[in-house]
Curated annotation (Swiss-Prot):
GO CC, alphabetical: cytosol; endolysosome membrane; late endosome membrane; lysosomal membrane; lysosome; melanosome membrane; monoatomic ion channel complex
Listed GO MF terms: identical protein binding; intracellularly phosphatidylinositol-3,5-bisphosphate-gated monatomic cation channel activity; ligand-gated sodium channel activity; NAADP-sensitive calcium-release channel activity; phosphatidylinositol-3,5-bisphosphate binding; protein kinase binding; voltage-gated calcium channel activity
Domain notes: Each of the two internal repeats contains five hydrophobic transmembrane segments (S1, S2, S3, S5, S6) and one positively charged transmembrane segment (S4). S4 segments probably represent the voltage-sensor and are characterized by a series of positively charged amino acids at every third position.
Stretches in topological domain Extracellular: 90-111, 161-167, 225-238, 264-270, 439-449, 508-524, 586-618, 642-656
Substitution effect: residue 594 to A: Loss of N-glycosylation
Keywords recorded for this protein, A-Z: Calcium, Calcium channel, Calcium transport, Endosome, Glycoprotein, Ion channel, Ion transport, Lysosome, Membrane, Repeat, Transmembrane, Transmembrane helix, Transport, Voltage-gated channel
Gene3D superfamilies, sorted: 1.10.287.70, Voltage-gated potassium channels. Chain C (1.20.120.350)
Identification of the protein by name: Two pore channel protein 2
Organism (species): Mus musculus
A Pfam match: Ion_trans
Protein family per UniProt: Belongs to the calcium channel alpha-1 subunit (TC 1.A.1.11) family. Two pore calcium channel subfamily.
Intervals, Cytoplasmic compartment: 1-68, 133-139, 189-203, 292-417, 471-486, 543-564, 678-731
């Protein structure tokens, strides 16, 4: 394009161009700098079209409104799984009591899905146009995006042509891709997992050898002889055949069925306990923890590579903006030399950048500290480090009172000792609830006398209300609301007050033998339980007042935004496995009396799927499938589910559940532990804390590891800029 052919630097702004052309060029430079800065802040690639029309489209596409709409469309197409056949609209997932669910008519969800696919097609078209044909052909994610859309559209057409009666909908399995491709951090996490797979596979091979060897040894040790009595045969049931033995030891690897597997053999001969102890020591305590260590080490290394790429993108985007905005000076007739970016040139760019007010003010203050002189490249780069820091909020000023009495009261109620008093009162309230729970544990709700507890609730809630009013008086309403703990405390206090007023209006004042009849949707006992539950939650207010607990809580809260990528990967895994499970196991779990495979309740084996009432663990709809997968991921009693599906669906169902265990409990949990450990180690490292500025806090994974990442060299940045297909520099 014409605008792209002109060099961005070195243009003679004093030439005889018409004023409108010079103004258009200057406006284009500003827009280019704005986009480069936004790319740097968001760690986006700068390899896209740079003409005026493309820049407008690019900024519109990455605007908050457009991205939120795209995020909602992704959420909408994923949530369709709860509505589509088989629908999850039943009160219970238990196959014994589940009613016939409402099923949407053919074409309803397909229409919504068509709208979503059309939106994704527009999304792909915009992305493809902005990066250009050359970049599009090299971008595997965009090519995969195109293929997923093609398969989804073809499958959608097949669904309509078969009147929504097709047995398999392939596009459901592909839906999580739309979530993956929209998150750069999820892509990096997935790439890190892929790079870590060889090392995981090596430990997995060791685990497989360990399992096979001990399975063979177990079969040799615990083989049932011809002369064994019936009770001995029952004791050795876990090693009846090779698949049974392998399954038993695999479950024992997760310690889920310990000591169930060991006790039958141990009962016969106490020396057999050594077999299970050695197996558990090698498998669970050594190899599984070795797998955790390897995943932590490998993932951390590959995560550093991904974050190094993000840092390079940040520096490259900032350097591109610097090159666009930098002025040149030099004697007449010589090649002008770069002298830097003037603050008056940069401030209009900063005003147009999509950035929150706090960070803009922080960057402006840093720019003003240069006292009007041009900023050099390193100084310009450091401006955008402010984006990763959350500045400490300045508390609003307290109200000014003239009366000495009011000033004394303000001092008392704003002192931290007043908070300690409130914590003691909250502790007393919690203890009183515990006392009554113990005293009334053997009584039915109708037999309990709630007179004393009701009076205590009134007294404590009255104190909480007075505490709220006193704090508002001392700090002022803006000052009171500036503390998150006060907002949490005040909100619960207001809810408690409203609940108590409703109780008074319906059931009047409490008195001895107070057992009124139920009026409205909630009984007196329900109202009391609701208020006491809120009081228990209110006790969490003590966390900010206990420093070690507050540090742990702040670390966890700071970790939550950085876990979105890991949470997204888990959502993708759940979604795909749930869809596969529905296609494989829908309808295989049948209620008692409907199949010869289902034993009568009286004849069910103790500890079996039927005897434990695990009927809701099925794949008859999407919601039930998610809960079943969750129960398997937790691995508590998961052998019961494995054994049941082996009976109902066949022995090959074990492959599905073992794969899910590997993906969720082994790989994902260990990746989560890796990030959690790194986060805690870094945040609690005294050296790390010394590097933080006073009044700031770390916000992102990139900043968390910034001190151990290598800064890109200027030569590398300039080489990449010169290779930009739509950007032409003079040097």
């Amino acid at each position: 394009m014409a605008a792209e052919e002109q060099p961005l630097l070195g243009r003679d702004r004093g030439s005889g161009q018409v004023h409108s052309g010079a103004a258009a060029d200057q406006e284009l430079c500003i827009d280019q700098a704005v986009v480069f800065i936004e790319d740097a802040i968001k760690y986006r690639s700068i390899y896209h079209r740079m003409d005026a029309g493309s820049l407008w489209l690019y900024r519109w596409y990455y605007s908050n409104v457009c991205q939120r709409v795209l995020g909602f469309i992704i959420f909408l197409i994923l949530i369709l799984a709860f509505v589509e056949v088989p629908s999850s609209f039943t009160k219970t997932a238990d196959v014994r009591y589940r009613s016939q669910p409402w099923q949407p008519p053919c074409g309803l969800t397909e229409t919504i899905e068509a709208f979503c696919l059309l939106a994704f097609l527009v999304d792909l078209s915009v992305k493809g146009y902005l990066v250009g044909q050359a970049q599009l052909q090299q971008n595997l994610w965009l090519l995969a995006y195109f293929m997923v859309l093609v398969v989804s559209v073809v499958d959608w057409i097949v669904s309509l042509s078969l009147a929504c009666e097709e047995p398999l909908r392939m596009r459901r399995l592909l839906r999580p891709f739309f979530l993956l491709q929209n998150s750069s951090m999820m892509k990096k996490t997935l790439k890190c997992i892929r790079w870590s797979l060889p090392e995981m596979a090596s430990v997995g091979l060791l685990l497989a050898i360990h399992l096979c060897l001990f399975t063979i040894i177990g079969m040799l040790l615990f083989t049932i002889g011809e002369k064994d009595e019936a009770q001995d045969q029952e004791r050795l049931a876990y090693f009846r055949n090779l698949p049974e033995a392998l399954t038993s030891l695999l479950v024992l690897l997760t310690t889920s069925n310990n000591p169930d597997v060991m006790i039958p053999a141990y009962t016969q001969n106490r020396a057999f306990a050594l077999f299970f102890i050695v197996f558990t020591l090698i498998g669970s305590l050594f190899l599984m923890n070795l797998l955790t260590a390897i995943i932590y080490n490998q993932f951390r290394g590959y995560l550093m590579k991904s974050l190094q790429t993000s840092l390079f993108r940040r520096r490259l985007g900032a350097r591109a903006a610097y090159e666009v905005l930098a002025s040149r000076a030099g004697p007449a007739g010589t090649t002008p030399e770069l002298v830097g970016v003037n603050p008056e040139t940069f401030l209009p760019v900063l005003q147009k950048t999509q950035l929150n007010k706090t960070h803009k003010q922080a960057i402006m203050q840093k720019v003003q500290s240069y006292e009007g002189r041009p900023m050099l490249a390193d100084e310009f780069q450091k401006l955008f480090d402010e984006v990763d820091k959350g500045l400490a909020k300045e508390r609003p000023l307290k109200p000014q009172y003239q009366s000495p009495f009011l000033q004394t009261a303000q001092f008392i109620f704003s002192h931290h000792y007043f908070d300690y008093l409130g914590n003691l009162v909250a502790l007393g309230n919690l203890l009183s609830i515990c006392v009554f729970l113990v005293l009334d544990s053997d009584l039915l709700p109708g037999e309990r006398d709630d007179f004393v507890l009701g009076i205590l609730d009134y007294i404590f809630i009255l104190y909480y209300l007075l505490e709220l009013l006193f704090k508002v008086f001392a700090l002022g309403l803006p000052g009171y609301l500036s503390y998150h703990s006060n907002v949490f405390d005040g909100l619960l206090t207001i809810i408690l007050l409203v609940s108590e007023i409703c109780t008074l209006a319906v059931y009047r004042l409490p008195h001895s033998g107070w057992k009124p009849e139920q009026y409205g949707p909630l009984s007196l006992w329900d109202m009391t339980r609701l208020m006491n539950t809120l009081i228990v939650f209110r006790f969490l207010r003590i966390i900010p007042n206990i420093k070690p607990m507050a540090e742990v809580a702040n670390t966890i809260l700071g970790l939550i935004p950085n876990l979105r990528a890991f949470g997204g990967i888990l959502v993708v895994a759940y979604y795909v496995f749930a869809m596969i499970g529905i296609n494989l196991f829908r309808g295989v779990i049948v209620p008692p009396g409907n199949s010869s495979l289902v034993p009568d309740n009286n004849s069910a084996v103790c500890g079996s799927f039927e005897q434990l009432g695990y009927w809701p663990n099925n794949f008859d709809d999407f919601a039930a499938a998610l809960i079943t997968l969750w129960n398997v991921m937790v691995v508590n009693n998961w052998q019961v589910i494995l054994e049941a599906y082996k009976r109902y669906a066949g022995p090959w169902s074990m492959v599905y559940f073992v794969l899910w265990w590997l993906v969720s409990s082994v790989i994902w949990i260990n990746l989560f532990l890796a990030l959690l450990l790194e986060n805690f180690l870094h945040r609690w490292d005294p050296q790390g804390h010394k590097q933080l500025l006073v009044g700031t806090k770390q916000m992102s994974v990139e900043l968390m590891f910034r001190d151990i990442l290598e800064e890109p060299k200027e030569e590398e940045l300039m080489e990449k800029l010169h290779k930009h297909p739509h950007l032409h520099l003079c040097r």
